[in-house]
Amino acid sequence: MRLAQRLLRSTAIWIDPMSFRPFTSESYAQNDRPEAWRDVLAAVGLQPVGGHGFFDGHATASHRHAAGVALTRMAAGAQSVGPLAQANEDLPIALMPVEDGMVLRSAGGHRIVPVGHLVLLPRGGDWSIVFQRDMRAIVLAVTSEALHGRLSGKPRLGEPRVISPSGFSDVFARLLDATARTLDSLSDAEWNSVAQSLVDLLLTLAHQLAASTSDAGSSATL
C-alpha cells in the first residue's frame, strides 16, 4: 500500500510530462526530506536500501519525463540504492556515475564502477549500488509505454551488467550525459526527440547484452 501511494504521489507531484523538474532538499521541511528523496528515486525505479540512507542532508536533482521515459541527474550524500519492486517488468534501468565512482553489489560479488561506465540494472533482483562518499549519477528509466507498441521484445537481464564506454556504448553514454546536462534548456519537441533516441539506444544495447549472455550460456552447454 505504501509503495502504491509513493508511486501515485511521485506521478502526481514530481513527474509532469515533458516539463523540467528541479529538486532541492532545502525546499522541504527537515522531517519531510527523506520521503521527498524517496519520491525522486522512485521516479526512476529506485529506492534507498541498507544502512546508507538519505536523512536530512543536502540533495539536488534535475528530472524530465516523457511517455514511458524518465531521466534524472542527481547529487546527494553517501547512500545505497536498490530496485523499487514493481509488478511490471520494463526495460533495464541505465545508471552512470559522474564525478565519482560507485560500488555494485550483486550475487556475483562486489565491483567498483568507475566514472563514465554504464550499468544496466534489472528492475528487480538482489542488487544494490553503494555511493561511498557522494552520490553523483545519471539515471534513465524506460517503460514499455515508450516503445509505442513496437513488437521488438523486451530484453531480459538476470544480473546487472557493467559496460565500459567503447563503441556503441560510448555513443549512448555521451548522449545520456549531454542530455542530462541540458534538461532545463530543451524545448518539449527537442526533449521528446532526444528521449526517443535514448529509448532506441537503450533497447539496442540491452538486446546486445541479453544476446551475448544467451550465446555464452549456449556455448557453456555444448
List each language-model region with its residue ranges.
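Residues in well-ordered beta-strands of folded domains
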Residues: A70-T72, L95, V130, A141
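Glycine- and acidic-residue-biased ligand/ion/polar-headgroup-sensing regions
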Residues: A66-A67, A75-S80, N88-L104
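Short histidine-centered beta-strand/loop micro-motifs
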Residues: V81-N88, I129-F131
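Sequence-level motif detector for i,i+2 pairs with an aromatic at +2
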Residues: A66-L71, E89, M135, L201
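Alpha-helical bundle regulatory/interaction domains
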Residues: R2-F55, V103-L222
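His/acidic/aromatic-lined binding-pocket segments of jelly-roll/cupin-type domains
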Residues: S62-H63, L84-A87, L91-M96, R111, ...
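A short glycine-rich, His/Asp/Glu-containing loop-to-beta-strand
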Residues: W37, D56-A78
